[in-house]
Amino acid sequence: FQVHQPNRLRQYRFFDIGKTSHYYDDFTTRTILRRIAKKCYLPMNELLLEQIKANNGAFKVAFSITGTALEQFDRYCPEVLDSFRALAQTGCVEFLSETYYHSLASLASEPEFKHQVLKHKAAIEHYFGQTPVTFRNTELVYSDDIADMVDSLGFKTILTEGAKHILGWQSPNFVYKTTAKHAQKLLLRNSGLSDDIAFRFSDRNWENWPLTTDKYLSWLKAGDGEIVNLFMDYETFGEHQAASSGIFDFMKYLPSAII
């Protein structure tokens, strides 16, 4: 799951120049964060914790949480941070590393990119007591040059997009290797199955609506490889897909059905 919250900018007028250098709209940032926490982060974290316990640790998930999101949780909604810590303590949750600010520094500056990744790595260690071994770049952007930079930082695995125009006839449901010195494992997101939940779940015009646990499980079993990597915005649950759509019930029964 991806978790990100930007620092929102306030309206800054021409006549503010020279009078104030506070560019951020803290009130809006706090208001939006607390709304999403109530609708998504808190109930979904509770659901995942219940499923981890119910399945005796056989159910595992991974989070990629930006540094700006962690800062906002700490400042405006510490109960969300506590709920992520509770998940971390189960030993069934992995925290991935990424750029601290959800930036595209990997495309512009190697020193800045490495600085942000190491800053984010330190934040994960501070908040959750984990040292990340898997890296995912902003928007899953990937290239051989990025793999080399990530390799030099010691990461063992990279998560990226299973882009059809790159894969061609190949499947995203296998573990690949990078061209970097230490040939990290390369995990590819299954865009179709991920987007079925993230974007199409509540679309009544979709030919496969409604999406049930049994139907989705049959698609997973029909996979043509070793693994299926699902990766989506965490706000899918309760924010993008409303609770009334049944998204929480879907996720409640999916782990045990798969396991």
Predicted region positions:
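Catalytic alpha-helical scaffold of carbohydrate-active enzymes acting on polysaccharides/glycoconjugates
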Residues: 1-134, 140-196, 202, 206-225, ...
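Periplasmic/ER-lumenal interhelical loops and adjacent helix-loop junctions
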Residues: 235-238
